[in-house]
């Protein structure tokens, strides 16, 4: 029946998301070994991180449950092909393409337990192991994966857990 197919699809999507989250946490944990850790927030709008796009407009805030699931970042609506910038200096620890979830995404480790994720890119300009500088172009925006239109989905993680990006911008 249609309802059993729908239930199966939901279960498959949930399993895929759990696998993605597990891989992300493992990459962050591996990169963070020996670099110390931080706890808590740096304060509202600390400026510790730069904006990942030229746009300051936010189309989906943190957290957002309106789509029926958890949205653990903020979305910057931009045209496909717009520059996506490293929010701070660091090392690229994960570059991946999925036809679901984040689509083409990047994770940068900034040390001391702080990392950033940039998703739904049309192209990626860096590789795992690359050192990047704050403001460096790391990707071009798109609408890959589960996306409602071109934007940059941006997450900040502390010790692997998502936190409110607005506290760091």
Regions found by a protein language model. Give the residues of each.
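Alpha-helical oligomerization segments with coiled-coil/rod-like character
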Residues: 1-43
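Catalytic cores of peptidoglycan-degrading enzymes
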Residues: 45-169
């Amino acid at each position: 029946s249609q309802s059993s197919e729908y239930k199966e699809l939901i279960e498959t999507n949930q399993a895929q998301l759990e696998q993605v989250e597990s891989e992300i946490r493992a990459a962050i944990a591996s990169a963070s070994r020996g670099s110390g850790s931080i706890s808590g927030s740096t304060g509202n709008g600390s400026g510790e991180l730069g904006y990942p796009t030229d746009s300051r407009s936010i189309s989906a805030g943190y957290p957002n449950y309106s789509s029926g699931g958890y949205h653990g970042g903020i979305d910057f609506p931009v045209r496909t092909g717009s520059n996506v910038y490293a929010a701070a200096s660091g090392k690229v620890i994960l570059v991946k393409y999925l036809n679901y979830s984040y689509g083409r995404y990047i994770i940068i480790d900034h040390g001391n337990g702080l990392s950033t994720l940039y998703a739904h890119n049309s192209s990626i300009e860096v590789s795992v192991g690359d050192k990047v500088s704050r403001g460096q172009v790391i990707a071009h925006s798109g609408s890959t994966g589960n996306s409602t239109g071109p934007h940059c989905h941006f997450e900040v993680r502390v010790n692997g857990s998502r936190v409110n990006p607005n506290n760091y911008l």
